[in-house]
């Protein structure tokens, strides 16, 4: 699989795509600078930045931001257990603020926080322009599907957003929540890995 940057600069006859590729690293820096300085939400919590290859074929929109190391470790483990090419992914949280109550306990993001962060999600999609999006968890899904849609009814479905093939799966936070309820999680973990593999296969088949 050739790198998109190489293909756009060396083998592309589309000047707009070449310009997008060349500007992508700058746009990633712009995104994180804007997020870090963002004061749209009254909470003004600490934030989680987007990272990865800004010219990736695969964009992963994760659940709302976290600073819990166990979550980060499981996410990395799932990537390692899949066939996904990790140099070809860009990862962005659906809500960048780490949402905590006044007592420092974690909470769900508010509708306003979700709405305020949507502009950053859309900006990310536009500058990465991936071949496929992986949406992990209900918060990510609500960035581009109305929030009255039931997540569990959509988790097995494929869709399109801005004309981009989009796969829906569970989030790492979902796995930990199911464990707290003493519910089995092997099938959910398998689903995430299968979705990662499906995204990579989709990219490979486009080559």
Listing of model-derived features with the role each one plays in the protein:
Residues 2-207:
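A polyanion-binding, active-site-adjacent surface
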């Amino acid at each position: 699989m050739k790198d998109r940057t190489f293909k756009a600069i060396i083998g592309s006859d589309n000047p707009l795509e070449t310009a997008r590729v060349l500007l992508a690293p700058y746009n990633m820096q712009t995104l994180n600078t804007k997020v870090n300085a963002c004061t749209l939400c009254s909470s003004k919590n600490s934030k989680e930045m987007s990272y990865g290859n800004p010219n990736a074929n695969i964009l992963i929109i994760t659940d709302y931001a976290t600073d819990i190391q166990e979550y980060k470790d499981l996410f990395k483990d799932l990537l390692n257990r899949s066939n996904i090419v990790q140099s070809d992914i860009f990862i962005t949280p659906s809500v960048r603020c780490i949402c905590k109550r006044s007592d420092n306990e974690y909470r769900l993001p508010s509708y306003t926080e979700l709405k305020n962060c949507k502009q950053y999600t859309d900006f990310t999609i536009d500058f990465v322009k991936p071949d496929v999006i992986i949406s992990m968890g209900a918060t990510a899904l609500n960035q581009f599907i109305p929030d009255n849609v039931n997540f569990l009814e959509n988790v097995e479905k494929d869709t399109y957003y801005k004309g981009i093939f989009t796969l829906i799966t569970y989030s790492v936070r979902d796995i930990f929540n199911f464990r707290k309820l003493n519910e089995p999680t092997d099938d959910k973990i398998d689903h995430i890995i299968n979705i990662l593999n499906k995204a990579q296969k989709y990219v490979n088949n486009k080559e």
